[in-house]
């Protein structure tokens, strides 16, 4: 990534998108499985500010590696605690995978018609793939 203002802005948008989708789907899945904790704490939202961790954000800026604020989950609310905890944990990485797939399809369609893909789509796709790889470790 270069350090011109446009690249920095595109990187920031990609990070906010990936982080927000990832954390939102942890919260959404927990809520659907019976745990209202994240909803009660205002985390069941697509507002990126609700999901930013100050230290994780600074690390993203400095090292291009960081994290969001962990979504609070209380397995005591789940009907099947072991299974539901795994589903909640998997929801974030799965959301990144689905997003990467969607942006990959968009990128391929644009290439097929010889339309240059927006740097945002390329950066977002690369970021989502990296996020998936990190979550699989």
Report the location of each language-model feature.
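Hydrophobic transmembrane alpha-helices and their immediate loop junctions
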Residues: 1-137
């Amino acid at each position: 990534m270069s350090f011109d203002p446009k690249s920095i802005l595109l990187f920031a948008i990609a990070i906010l998108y990936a982080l927000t989708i990832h954390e939102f789907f942890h919260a959404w899945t927990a809520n659907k499985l019976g745990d209202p904790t994240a909803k009660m704490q205002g985390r069941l939202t697509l507002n990126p500010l609700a999901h930013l961790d100050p230290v994780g954000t600074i690390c993203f800026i400095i090292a291009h590696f960081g994290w969001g604020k962990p979504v609070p989950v209380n397995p005591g609310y789940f009907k099947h605690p072991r299974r539901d905890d795994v589903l909640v944990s998997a929801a974030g990485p799965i959301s990144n995978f689905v997003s990467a797939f969607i942006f990959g399809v968009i990128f391929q369609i644009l290439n097929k018609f010889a339309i240059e893909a927006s740097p945002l789509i390329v950066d977002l796709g690369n970021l989502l793939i990296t996020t998936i790889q990190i979550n699989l470790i």
